[in-house]
Amino acid sequence: MQIGVVSDTHNNLKNIDIIISLFNKENIDLVIHTGDVTNANSLEKFSRLKCKLIGVYGNNDRNEKGLEEVAFKYNFLFQEPPNSINLCNRNIAIFHEPDIIDDFL
């Protein structure tokens, strides 16, 4: 399984397009976004991915309107950090702020 990880896209639509093209070209199986999408339009761009997208909200996402609606519309699994998933019998922690790791462990 190939996993793509991205963070802090901060509404940079040009870079998001580049990221999506790269992940699609490399046949990535899953993309994990570790926060700071910052805008519903940015998150909607990720609908062009040819794989599943999961992630957590970052510190700049909490007050943005529309992120939850876009995540629901495209079946993206976005949650408040910390979060974890089990892939290939491995637990993977997903969080935005590095100081949260002590609470997670």
Predicted features and spans:
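Conserved beta-sheet core of the metallophosphoesterase superfamily
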Residues: 54, 97-105
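Active-site alpha/beta core segments
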Residues: 60-61, 97
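Short amphipathic alpha-helix with an adjacent loop that forms part of the alpha/beta core around
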Residues: 20-24, 85-86, 103-105
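Acidic/Gly/His-enriched mid-domain segments of enzyme catalytic cores or analogous surface patches
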Residues: 79, 83, 87, 99
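N-terminal active-site segment of His-dependent metallophosphoesterases
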Residues: 1-49, 62-64, 68-76, 80-81
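Beta-strand-turn-beta hairpins that frame and shape the catalytic cleft
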Residues: 1-4, 84-92
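Short internal beta-strands
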Residues: 32, 54-58
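Histidine-centered divalent metal-coordination motifs
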Residues: 10, 94-96
